[in-house]
Amino acid sequence: MFCTTLRNSYDLTMSKSKSLKKNSICFLYDKQYAKEGYELEIKEDQILVKGNSAGLFYGMQTLLQLIPATAQENIQIPPLLIRDKPKFEYRGAMLDVGRYFYSPEFIKKFIDFISAYKLNTFHWHLTEDAGWRIEIKKYPQLTQLGAWRRGTKIHRNPGSFDNLPNGGYYTQKEIKEIVAYAALRNVTIIPEINMPGHTLALLTAFPELSCTGGPFHVLEEWGVQKDVMCIGNEKLYGLVEDILSEVLELFPSKIIHIGGDEVPVERWKQCAKCQSLLKKEGLTREHELQGYFVRRIGKFLASKNRRMMGWDEVLECNVGKDVIIQSWRGEQGGIKAANMGHHVLMSPTSFMYFDYYQGNPATEPIGISDRCIIPLEKVYSYNPVNENIQTEFHKYILGVQGNFWCEFIHSEQKLEYMIFPRLFALAEIAWSESKDTYEGFCKRAFKQFDYLDRNRVNYRVPEPVILKEESTDGSNVLNFRMKYFVDGAEIYYTIDGRDPLLYGKRYEKESVSMNLKKGEKTLKCVVRMPSGKVSQTFITNYKII
């Protein structure tokens, strides 16, 4: 794999040898190293990478990052010694393919992205109201009817549908290939079959397993739907166990995600079968029916030597300590679960939802809500071990995960834009025990843009850091400077509201002054990268307070 990467990225060909030689790169397997730890030593005439199998892979990734992206035939790396191991055992990224189907080739590319930066888990969100994406051979109706929708809501405005058929699914053969591809890159794939809510695609194929009997169609817009699985229908459990049995054959992961989020109970309140089950089990509230369902599915998975994971609503289902809780509605669910002795994966909306805007919604591609903004600096500031988790329970925080929900991410190019550079920040907080300053992080991380350019990967060009200093003499003058962390990048700006790409002045590290006496002033700037790639227009308004 290392030789292939060097050939593809640098047009360098290396020969393999079983003996140590000068001017060679040696990978030495040593099981005494920590599970994913490694040692990388660069000498004048030799490079040594030591570790177990996973550690060797991560040592290789570090070595590749040390090679300048612009390097040609003569590659030079200064001598150094690195001893490294991860902070968290679970370092993940989730991709929602339920809203939009991404090709098997792109799924492999996504795995390349995360593995290159030492993430080791791909949470594959395979089913949704908007699409069923996994072939189940016993029930071909699931993909025949559930994998396709008539159109898609493409904007938050009412009635903004494209009326274009959309869909797709992964065959079991494709899934096996992807699982094997990931394993070679030290990535475990955790499949998610979301239930008992977010199941309109399934109910389109099996309306009799709902409380009303349907008919249904695969969802064309976004939001929480009232129609969910009928918990009181015994036939439901046979279908769910059949589906999971095929899923377990495809995915060797010890963890299986069953969703469990956003499950309305309105239909259960009016359903004779659900009310009968409620009475039979001695339950008092419809919400407890979800607990019955989750515990029953958990027992089935345990019988197959698998462990259940669910979104943090599952914590309310009186589940056993073996269930992993994924905290998403803020951090409170994860804090509570860890203090109870549950293993926890932290992925709160406030830090780890990478479908959220990266900057000003006015100049960014459309996102889920104008109120939802998670810039790069906020991602980097996150600490998955919240201070409200008691010290003795810190060990229950398995790790951290970034989530890519795709309601408005309709293309691979836009998905790449949402991935980078926030993936760099996620990778660092997941791996590194110590934390750098944000400026230090940017100086290191932004060097990776050369690699993305070289491999034709899209990314968001970050805005400059603006250092402002208001006048203290009552003159209402605002002075500011701008900093950027990419060698050769250029900043163009205006302070009169005009387009900086057309009319902007090139910033030369000078102090820029704004007189705010006459009302609000607008700073607009763009960044032009050495590759020629240009940022969105960054807009900041200033006024006298």
Residue ranges: model-predicted function:
Residues 90-94, 121-123, 186-190, 228, ...:
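Structural preference for beta-strand elements that scaffold enzyme active sites
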Residues 96-129:
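A conserved hydrophobic secondary-structure block that centers on an alpha-helix together
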Residues 130-184, 199-238, 266-286:
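Aromatic- and acidic-residue-enriched carbohydrate-binding clefts of CAZyme catalytic domains
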Residues 307-323, 329-481:
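Flexible, acidic glycine-rich loops studded with aromatic residues
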